[in-house]
Protein backbone atom coordinates (compact mmCIF):
# COMPACT_ATOMS: atom_id res chain seq x y z
CA UNK A 1 0.00 0.00 0.00
CA UNK A 2 1.30 3.46 -0.90
CA UNK A 3 2.58 5.54 2.00
CA UNK A 4 0.31 8.51 2.71
CA UNK A 5 1.95 11.91 3.13
CA UNK A 6 0.07 14.20 5.49
CA UNK A 7 0.37 17.98 5.60
CA UNK A 8 0.50 19.89 8.88
CA UNK A 9 1.05 23.54 9.82
CA UNK A 10 3.06 24.32 12.95
CA UNK A 11 4.33 27.60 14.39
CA UNK A 12 7.98 28.10 15.29
CA UNK A 13 9.24 31.44 16.61
CA UNK A 14 6.02 33.03 15.37
CA UNK A 15 6.51 31.71 11.82
CA UNK A 16 3.99 29.31 10.26
CA UNK A 17 5.83 26.28 8.89
CA UNK A 18 4.27 23.81 6.46
CA UNK A 19 5.42 20.27 7.24
CA UNK A 20 4.86 16.91 5.58
CA UNK A 21 4.68 13.78 7.73
CA UNK A 22 4.63 10.16 6.56
CA UNK A 23 5.14 6.63 7.80
CA UNK A 24 5.88 5.16 11.18
CA UNK A 25 8.79 3.41 12.82
CA UNK A 26 11.29 3.36 15.65
CA UNK A 27 13.47 6.00 14.00
CA UNK A 28 12.34 9.44 12.83
CA UNK A 29 13.99 10.97 9.77
CA UNK A 30 13.86 14.73 9.16
CA UNK A 31 14.53 15.81 5.56
CA UNK A 32 15.71 19.37 4.84
CA UNK A 33 15.47 20.68 1.28
CA UNK A 34 17.83 22.98 -0.60
CA UNK A 35 17.76 26.62 -1.68
CA UNK A 36 16.74 28.56 -4.79
CA UNK A 37 13.06 27.76 -5.31
CA UNK A 38 13.19 24.34 -3.67
CA UNK A 39 10.63 22.95 -1.23
CA UNK A 40 10.02 19.81 0.79
CA UNK A 41 7.94 18.02 -1.83
CA UNK A 42 10.00 19.22 -4.78
CA UNK A 43 13.13 17.62 -3.34
CA UNK A 44 11.84 14.80 -1.20
CA UNK A 45 8.46 13.43 -2.38
CA UNK A 46 9.89 10.27 -3.97
CA UNK A 47 12.35 9.49 -1.16
CA UNK A 48 9.74 10.23 1.48
CA UNK A 49 7.37 7.60 0.10
CA UNK A 50 10.12 4.97 0.06
CA UNK A 51 11.55 5.70 3.51
CA UNK A 52 8.04 6.04 4.94
CA UNK A 53 7.63 2.28 4.51
CA UNK A 54 10.05 1.74 7.43
CA UNK A 55 10.36 5.00 9.33
CA UNK A 56 8.52 8.12 10.33
CA UNK A 57 9.63 10.84 7.91
CA UNK A 58 9.12 14.59 8.39
CA UNK A 59 9.94 17.17 5.71
CA UNK A 60 9.35 20.89 6.38
CA UNK A 61 9.20 23.77 3.95
CA UNK A 62 11.84 26.11 5.36
CA UNK A 63 10.70 29.71 6.02
CA UNK A 64 10.43 31.58 2.73
CA UNK A 65 9.95 28.37 0.74
CA UNK A 66 6.93 26.33 -0.35
CA UNK A 67 3.90 26.87 1.85
CA UNK A 68 5.73 28.35 4.85
CA UNK A 69 5.70 31.99 5.89
CA UNK A 70 8.28 34.52 4.78
CA UNK A 71 9.97 36.75 7.35
CA UNK A 72 10.93 40.42 7.36
CA UNK A 73 14.47 39.84 8.64
CA UNK A 74 17.54 38.10 7.24
CA UNK A 75 17.53 34.42 6.32
CA UNK A 76 20.76 33.49 8.07
CA UNK A 77 22.14 30.05 8.81
CA UNK A 78 21.56 30.76 12.48
CA UNK A 79 17.90 31.61 11.85
CA UNK A 80 17.33 28.40 9.91
CA UNK A 81 19.13 26.36 12.56
CA UNK A 82 16.88 27.71 15.32
CA UNK A 83 13.85 27.03 13.10
CA UNK A 84 14.81 23.38 12.55
CA UNK A 85 15.47 22.98 16.27
CA UNK A 86 11.95 24.26 16.88
CA UNK A 87 10.46 21.91 14.29
CA UNK A 88 12.11 18.85 15.85
CA UNK A 89 10.94 19.90 19.29
CA UNK A 90 7.40 20.63 18.05
CA UNK A 91 7.08 17.07 16.71
CA UNK A 92 8.48 15.72 20.01
CA UNK A 93 10.64 13.23 18.14
CA UNK A 94 14.31 13.77 19.06
CA UNK A 95 16.87 12.48 18.63
CA UNK A 96 16.35 12.21 14.86
CA UNK A 97 18.16 11.08 11.75
CA UNK A 98 18.79 14.48 10.15
CA UNK A 99 19.19 14.53 6.36
CA UNK A 100 19.97 17.85 4.70
CA UNK A 101 20.43 18.69 1.03
CA UNK A 102 22.60 21.63 -0.08
CA UNK A 103 21.39 24.56 2.08
CA UNK A 104 19.65 21.96 4.24
CA UNK A 105 22.98 20.17 4.55
CA UNK A 106 24.57 23.31 5.95
CA UNK A 107 21.71 23.62 8.43
CA UNK A 108 22.17 19.97 9.42
CA UNK A 109 25.90 20.49 10.02
CA UNK A 110 25.20 23.55 12.14
CA UNK A 111 22.56 21.60 14.07
CA UNK A 112 25.08 18.83 14.73
CA UNK A 113 27.58 21.33 16.11
CA UNK A 114 25.13 23.31 18.24
CA UNK A 115 22.37 20.86 19.21
CA UNK A 116 23.95 17.39 19.09
CA UNK A 117 21.44 16.07 21.63
CA UNK A 118 18.69 16.38 18.99
CA UNK A 119 20.49 14.29 16.36
CA UNK A 120 21.10 10.56 16.41
CA UNK A 121 22.59 10.25 12.92
CA UNK A 122 23.67 12.96 10.45
CA UNK A 123 23.36 12.71 6.66
CA UNK A 124 24.51 15.83 4.76
CA UNK A 125 23.85 15.61 1.00
CA UNK A 126 25.90 17.75 -1.41
CA UNK A 127 26.02 20.06 1.56
CA UNK A 128 26.69 23.73 2.04
CA UNK A 129 29.55 24.20 4.51
CA UNK A 130 31.82 21.33 3.49
CA UNK A 131 34.22 23.98 2.17
CA UNK A 132 36.03 27.08 3.47
CA UNK A 133 35.24 29.00 0.28
CA UNK A 134 33.04 28.64 -2.77
CA UNK A 135 34.40 27.93 -6.25
CA UNK A 136 35.20 31.33 -7.84
CA UNK A 137 34.53 32.85 -4.43
CA UNK A 138 35.17 36.54 -5.13
CA UNK A 139 33.14 36.43 -8.34
CA UNK A 140 30.32 34.69 -6.45
CA UNK A 141 30.48 37.35 -3.72
CA UNK A 142 30.04 40.08 -6.35
CA UNK A 143 27.29 38.21 -8.20
CA UNK A 144 25.17 37.59 -5.10
CA UNK A 145 24.98 41.35 -4.55
CA UNK A 146 24.23 42.23 -8.17
CA UNK A 147 20.97 43.07 -9.94
CA UNK A 148 21.54 39.97 -12.08
CA UNK A 149 20.98 37.81 -9.02
CA UNK A 150 17.96 39.87 -7.93
CA UNK A 151 16.15 39.20 -11.19
CA UNK A 152 17.41 35.71 -12.06
CA UNK A 153 14.46 33.59 -10.96
CA UNK A 154 11.60 35.59 -12.45
CA UNK A 155 13.48 36.07 -15.71
CA UNK A 156 14.50 32.41 -16.05
CA UNK A 157 10.99 31.21 -15.18
CA UNK A 158 9.57 32.86 -18.29
CA UNK A 159 11.46 30.49 -20.58
CA UNK A 160 10.85 26.72 -20.30
CA UNK A 161 13.89 25.91 -22.43
CA UNK A 162 16.21 27.77 -20.05
CA UNK A 163 14.65 26.09 -17.01
CA UNK A 164 15.11 22.70 -18.69
CA UNK A 165 18.74 23.48 -19.55
CA UNK A 166 19.48 24.74 -16.05
CA UNK A 167 18.08 21.59 -14.43
CA UNK A 168 20.03 19.34 -16.81
CA UNK A 169 23.28 21.30 -16.48
CA UNK A 170 23.26 22.00 -12.74
CA UNK A 171 21.16 19.37 -10.99
CA UNK A 172 20.95 16.13 -13.01
CA UNK A 173 23.59 13.90 -14.54
CA UNK A 174 20.94 11.90 -16.43
CA UNK A 175 19.10 14.43 -18.60
CA UNK A 176 16.22 11.99 -19.19
CA UNK A 177 15.17 12.60 -15.57
CA UNK A 178 14.33 16.22 -16.41
CA UNK A 179 10.64 15.67 -17.17
CA UNK A 180 8.19 18.25 -18.48
CA UNK A 181 6.26 17.96 -15.22
CA UNK A 182 9.39 18.89 -13.26
CA UNK A 183 10.15 21.80 -15.59
CA UNK A 184 6.64 23.15 -15.01
CA UNK A 185 6.90 22.64 -11.24
CA UNK A 186 10.15 24.60 -11.11
CA UNK A 187 8.81 27.30 -13.46
CA UNK A 188 5.75 27.81 -11.29
CA UNK A 189 7.98 28.25 -8.24
CA UNK A 190 10.23 30.69 -10.11
CA UNK A 191 7.30 32.89 -11.10
CA UNK A 192 6.12 33.38 -7.51
CA UNK A 193 6.55 37.05 -6.49
CA UNK A 194 9.03 36.25 -3.68
CA UNK A 195 10.94 33.56 -5.60
CA UNK A 196 14.63 33.47 -4.79
CA UNK A 197 14.55 36.26 -2.22
CA UNK A 198 15.19 34.03 0.83
CA UNK A 199 18.21 32.46 -0.86
CA UNK A 200 19.57 35.84 -1.95
CA UNK A 201 19.25 37.02 1.65
CA UNK A 202 21.06 33.87 2.83
CA UNK A 203 23.84 34.36 0.28
CA UNK A 204 24.38 37.98 1.27
CA UNK A 205 24.43 37.15 4.97
CA UNK A 206 26.77 34.17 4.68
CA UNK A 207 29.13 34.87 1.76
CA UNK A 208 31.76 37.44 2.73
CA UNK A 209 34.48 38.80 0.47
CA UNK A 210 37.07 36.38 1.83
CA UNK A 211 35.09 33.38 3.08
CA UNK A 212 31.90 32.35 4.84
CA UNK A 213 30.30 34.14 7.75
CA UNK A 214 29.51 30.84 9.49
CA UNK A 215 32.66 28.74 9.31
CA UNK A 216 31.44 25.15 9.46
CA UNK A 217 34.47 23.73 7.68
CA UNK A 218 36.95 24.42 10.49
CA UNK A 219 34.61 22.69 12.98
CA UNK A 220 33.89 19.49 11.05
CA UNK A 221 36.21 17.60 13.38
CA UNK A 222 33.87 18.42 16.29
CA UNK A 223 30.91 16.48 14.88
CA UNK A 224 30.22 13.72 17.38
CA UNK A 225 27.47 11.53 15.92
CA UNK A 226 27.84 8.91 13.17
CA UNK A 227 27.74 10.71 9.83
CA UNK A 228 27.08 9.67 6.25
CA UNK A 229 27.98 12.07 3.46
CA UNK A 230 26.08 11.43 0.23
CA UNK A 231 27.41 13.24 -2.81
CA UNK A 232 26.93 13.36 -6.56
CA UNK A 233 30.18 12.61 -8.37
CA UNK A 234 29.53 15.34 -10.96
CA UNK A 235 28.19 18.04 -8.65
CA UNK A 236 29.22 21.48 -9.94
CA UNK A 237 27.91 23.51 -6.99
CA UNK A 238 29.78 21.52 -4.32
CA UNK A 239 32.59 19.60 -6.06
CA UNK A 240 33.24 16.03 -4.99
CA UNK A 241 36.70 16.99 -3.72
CA UNK A 242 34.99 18.93 -0.91
CA UNK A 243 33.09 15.85 0.24
CA UNK A 244 36.23 13.71 0.03
CA UNK A 245 38.14 16.19 2.20
CA UNK A 246 35.26 16.55 4.67
CA UNK A 247 34.92 12.78 5.05
CA UNK A 248 38.48 12.72 6.40
CA UNK A 249 37.82 15.54 8.87
CA UNK A 250 34.57 14.25 10.40
CA UNK A 251 35.57 11.60 12.98
CA UNK A 252 32.93 8.88 12.49
CA UNK A 253 32.11 9.39 8.83
CA UNK A 254 31.21 7.33 5.79
CA UNK A 255 30.99 8.67 2.23
CA UNK A 256 28.66 7.34 -0.46
CA UNK A 257 29.31 8.72 -3.93
CA UNK A 258 26.37 8.60 -6.34
CA UNK A 259 28.18 8.12 -9.62
CA UNK A 260 27.06 10.36 -12.46
CA UNK A 261 24.75 12.48 -10.28
CA UNK A 262 25.07 16.21 -9.82
CA UNK A 263 23.46 18.40 -7.14
CA UNK A 264 20.11 16.58 -6.81
CA UNK A 265 21.08 12.91 -6.35
CA UNK A 266 18.01 12.07 -4.24
CA UNK A 267 15.76 13.30 -7.05
CA UNK A 268 17.73 11.62 -9.83
CA UNK A 269 17.96 8.17 -8.20
CA UNK A 270 15.58 8.07 -5.21
CA UNK A 271 15.65 4.27 -4.88
CA UNK A 272 19.45 4.16 -4.54
CA UNK A 273 19.40 7.14 -2.19
CA UNK A 274 16.77 5.57 0.07
CA UNK A 275 18.61 2.23 0.10
CA UNK A 276 21.85 3.91 1.19
CA UNK A 277 20.04 5.78 3.98
CA UNK A 278 18.27 2.58 5.12
CA UNK A 279 21.53 0.62 5.15
CA UNK A 280 23.27 3.33 7.16
CA UNK A 281 20.49 3.42 9.74
CA UNK A 282 20.43 -0.38 9.97
CA UNK A 283 24.19 -0.44 10.44
CA UNK A 284 23.80 1.75 13.51
CA UNK A 285 21.31 -0.75 15.03
CA UNK A 286 18.37 1.65 15.03
Language-model features, listed with the residues they occupy:
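Flexible "cap/lid" loop of the alpha/beta hydrolase fold
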Residues: 113, 121-155
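Short beta-strand/loop motif that positions the catalytic acidic residue
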Residues: 223, 229-231
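Conserved alpha/beta-hydrolase catalytic His-Asp/Glu region
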Residues: 156-219
